[in-house]
């Protein structure tokens, strides 16, 4: 007669609720290499939904900027049609006339020519400011900078003649992007600068 076994019977298997899936899913992240091959990842890549939401927000901001420009030009046309006072201007006519006379071929200038130039220059400055401000808002800044004007010029085909006058500082843009990635404040990236006088620096001529 054989002796009875004293080992308890194995417990029943747990109920199967679904297909077993490892967590995190296999292949979701590339396998780490180097001395920290067995360390868990600290940051997961952003989900595709976040990237799609960011792209949608960018497209919405661009559409809003385009709508603002359309409203701006419609308002300018209304102002021109209802203008009756041609004596008061935001830009000095004497300065404009002096610039016009810088051309040696110009001998005489009619009285209404500087008036038209003053209005055209004012509209040019306003449109360029609108486009630069749209770029500043895209970067979540409330201060219009030279880089915003340069970006507006680069984006607008009719402003191509200004590319050499206001070149875009690619090195500064790369420096700002690297600073943001490292979490370091940088004025060009819309973060508060460590130096409060950063915006008041004037490059020597």
From Swiss-Prot:
Region ranges (Disordered): 1-24
GO CC terms in record: cytoplasm; nucleus
SUPFAM superfamilies membership: Histone-fold
Pfam family of the protein (one): Histone
Molecular function as annotated in GO: DNA binding; DNA-binding transcription factor activity, RNA polymerase II-specific; protein heterodimerization activity
Domain of life: Eukaryota
Gene3D superfamilies: Histone, subunit A (1.10.20.10)
Keyword field contains Transcription: yes
Disulfide pairings: none
Subcellular localization: Nucleus; Cytoplasm
Chief subcellular location: nucleus
One record GO biological process: regulation of transcription by RNA polymerase II
Keywords, ordered alphabetically: Cytoplasm, DNA-binding, Nucleus, Transcription, Transcription regulation
Keyword Chloroplast annotated: no
PANTHER family, alphabetized: HISTONE-LIKE TRANSCRIPTION FACTOR CCAAT-RELATED (PTHR10252), NUCLEAR TRANSCRIPTION FACTOR Y SUBUNIT C-3-RELATED (PTHR10252:SF106)
Protein role: Component of the NF-Y/HAP transcription factor complex.
Protein family: Belongs to the NFYC/HAP5 subunit family.
Assembly and oligomerization: Heterotrimeric transcription factor composed of three components, NF-YA, NF-YB and NF-YC. NF-YB and NF-YC must interact and dimerize for NF-YA association and DNA binding. Interacts with NFYB2. Interacts with NFYB8, NFYB10 and HD5/NFYB11.
Protein name from the UniProt record: Nuclear transcription factor Y subunit C-6
Species per Swiss-Prot/TrEMBL record: Oryza sativa subsp. japonica (Rice)
Gene (UniProt): NFYC6
């Amino acid at each position: 007669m054989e002796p009875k076994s004293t080992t308890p019977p194995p417990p029943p298997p747990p109920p199967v609720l679904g297909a077993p899936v490892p967590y995190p899913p296999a292949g979701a992240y590339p396998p780490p290499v180097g001395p920290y091959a067995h360390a868990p990842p600290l940051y997961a890549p952003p989900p595709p939904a976040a990237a799609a939401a960011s792209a949608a927000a960018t497209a919405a901001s661009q559409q809003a900027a385009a709508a603002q420009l359309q409203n701006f030009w419609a308002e300018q046309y209304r102002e021109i049609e209802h203008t009756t006072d041609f004596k008061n201007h935001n830009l000095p006519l004497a300065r404009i006339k002096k610039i016009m006379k810088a051309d040696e071929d110009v001998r005489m200038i009619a009285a209404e020519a500087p008036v038209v130039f003053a209005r055209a220059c004012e509209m040019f400055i306003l449109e360029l400011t609108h486009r630069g401000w749209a770029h500043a808002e895209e970067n979540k800044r409330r201060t219009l900078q030279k880089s915003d004007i340069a970006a507006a010029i680069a984006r607008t085909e009719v402003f191509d003649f200004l590319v050499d006058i206001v070149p875009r500082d690619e090195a500064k843009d790369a420096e700002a992007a690297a600073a943001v990635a490292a979490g370091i404040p940088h004025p060009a990236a819309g973060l508060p600068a460590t130096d409060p006088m950063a915006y008041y620096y004037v490059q020597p001529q």
